[in-house]
Amino acid sequence: MEKKLGLAALTALVLSSMLGAGVFSLPQNMAEVASPAALLIGWGITGVGILLLALAMLFLTRLRPDLDGGIFTYAREGFGELVGFCSAWGYWLCAVIANVSYLVIVFSALSFFTDSPELRLFGDGNTWQAIVGASVLLWVVHFLVLRGVQTAASINLAATLAKLVPLGLFVVLAVIAFHMPTFTLDFTGVDLGVPVWEQVKNTMLITLWVFIGVEGAVVVSARARNKKDVGMATLLAVLAALTVYLLVTLLSLGVLARPELAQMRNPSMAGLMVKMMGSWGEVIIAAGLIVSVCGAYLSWTIMAAEVPLLAAQYKAFPRLFARQNARNAPSASLWLTNASVQICLVLIWATGSNYNTLLTIASEMILVPYFLVGAFLLKIAHRPLHKAIAVGACIYGLWLLYASGPMHLLLSVVLYAPGVLFFLYARRTHVENVALKGQEKIVIGLLLVAALPATWMLVR
């Protein structure tokens, strides 16, 4: 496949990967921890931080247009092969586990239409019927992407537009129903009994996750029609997502008082729609949630398959995963990715285990490459503007790692350790097997040793 992804397709890929299931629960999530004043401050800080990260990606695509797949290649080029591999491995692993959760959420949302007190068909998305349905959806998307990334991206563009319809309807109705006295009631959150700055921190513990996927266009940059579109698509998608999040959370506080909104069950947007337009509102949001998550799942499947392909081309993953089919789709890495997702689905059903801890740890691994984006720009920047953006992106990246929980970052060595063994095997599969550097050997040794106590802490 030739480089055919235009600005619209790239923007949709990024926006769709960010707008998943979370936006439909944001009203309650935010109202539970923060007042309108804290929300305005929290979104302001988050907005500046994510825009700095998006600008860092934009500048890197202009300064180093030769580097495809950003998240992996920026880390490799700036900080060595081992750091590059860990960035790719952590990103891919997070994408796999996130895709499992998307499939579970889809069928949990479908239970709104199929389940009743007498019949539990899909339940919370972990019944055997839900797992069978999720498996069918998994392999339908698999063969869709095998037809070519351009085909999948075109469908994703349509899905992104479709998911914006219920969100747009919600915003319009919320503007009409907005009542300023309701919004300003207890504006600083006295009833919460928490200082405003503590409320701000609590909002940012939520907002740090809603922009995961911002790197989508950079990951598939090798397939862009024009490299300049990559950075612009990232910036446009961030601005669009930030606008949606701001409108959804702030307008909701003018429809219902914060204490009442905080008690709603999720997806809270459905309850608000019922209040504004009757029982059909819940149906619209449930359908919108399903379309939204399916679109996000398609985006993440494309991105998850692209990373092993690029890593194999740079000799960080086994040579096998550099294979592409006649349509230039990353066939080998797609099989690896979706086979891993399928195994996880079966394990969830068979064990009935809660994988939320694993999802949290893996999600933290995706934040490390965000910091490395800023660090790489700082390393190669010459102009004062570029350096200033790089410093800001680094600070925001460090904040993300701190706010999401340093302990989870430490526990992530449990997932990095098998990756290191995979890295050592991968090097043997390539003709040019370059010897490890001394410091790389030390880091590998430390990771393997640290994995033992980390595993004990995780299972105890």
PLM-predicted stretches and their roles:
Residues M1-Q28, E32-V33, A37-L40, I50-L58, ...:
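Membrane-interface "cap" regions at the ends of multi-pass membrane proteins
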Residues M1-E2, L40, G44, P117-Q129, ...:
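Helix-loop-helix junctions that connect adjacent transmembrane segments
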Residues L110, Q129-M180, T234-V238, S363-P369, ...:
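Membrane-interface loop-to-helix entry segments
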Residues F72-A75, G80, F112-P117, T203, ...:
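TM-loop-TM module centered on a large, flexible mid-protein loop between adjacent transmembrane helices
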